[in-house]
């Protein structure tokens, strides 16, 4: 009894991570079909596969699928759980397939116990290959997950770069505004310093003027009155002295009143001046505050200058690098230009040679035409002379062309005719 067994099992699947999708569906083995015949006929055992979509339906791209919305870690965990459940189903189906194969082998052993064949080696090879396929699929899934993680990292870095670029632009705008503010504060500080200096000078002048006024109105302690009396007729000396004393007392009282009035006025003025130093101190406090602000702005300005110098260094490095590349490109272009110039010279030389050869060809064609006419004329003369029984002997000629070239260029061409004697 002859029997044939053919086993076909073609599971195939492709796994993709968050950035990809399921390629083609996994094919699961189903129950084998057995065709047999009575009376020792051939038995054919075949396994067919059916397509079974992966659990959870078909998956599209990672960005358009609803499964990938939300947190990326939760999505990847969900995908890993689905993959694990899918592999468990595959193992369960493989175990069911093995059970069916064992039942079929038992059935064949019962039908044909004499023709027992050992398929253990093939089964081991199949099992080993199936394990390799599963390992390859797992490795493929891990690689795709790594690729998706790398893509997500690249997207994050691009987003960070865009944010840093926008932040840099904002800082540049803010630095420009701070520079304008610094210029305005410098102008205001200069004006305030000039105003304070003017007020100090005015205060010094007022003090000097006050001292001068005090010196003018000051009555010295050794004030003496010198009285000179002319010796004239004798008058009442006591009465005259009394009148003079009263007059000078009136003058002294008037001076005292004037001094009191002037003192009160100067006291009021000094009280006002005493109040003005508070204003000066407040302005000095403002000046100190402006100086601190100015120092802070100078620090920020130095920081921005350092950033600017770093960017200028980067720009110079980039320019030097691209200048080197440009120089290389210019060298390549100059090399190709030299080759093009040589090619043009070569074409000109070939064109000159072609013109010379064309002239020689034209000259030869003219000579051939002339010889043809001469030959035709000689043939007619030969016919006439044949009638008169005259013999004509033709003398053949050999044309020798001599060409002289220097450095590949044709400089001389001669055509010589040599008669060939019979």
Curated annotation (Swiss-Prot):
Region (Coil 1A): 72-107
Stretches for region Coil 1B: 126-217
Miscellaneous comment as given in the Swiss-Prot or TrEMBL entry: There are two types of cytoskeletal and microfibrillar keratin: I (acidic; 40-55 kDa) and II (neutral to basic; 56-70 kDa).
Alphabetized SMART domains for the sequence: Filament (SM01391)
Gene Ontology biological process terms, A to Z: epithelial cell differentiation; intermediate filament organization
Gene3D superfamilies, sorted: 1.20.5.170, Single helix bin, Vasodilator-stimulated phosphoprotein
Segments of this protein annotated with the region Head: 1-71
Organism: Homo sapiens
Annotated region (Disordered), positions in chain: 1-73
GO cellular component, as recorded: cytoskeleton; cytosol; intermediate filament
Stretch list, region Coil 2: 241-378
The keyword Coiled coil belongs to this UniProt entry's keyword annotation: yes
Keywords: Coiled coil, Intermediate filament, Keratin
Region annotation Rod-like helical tail: where it falls in the sequence: 379-422
Protein name: Keratin, type I cytoskeletal 23
Gene name tied to this protein: KRT23
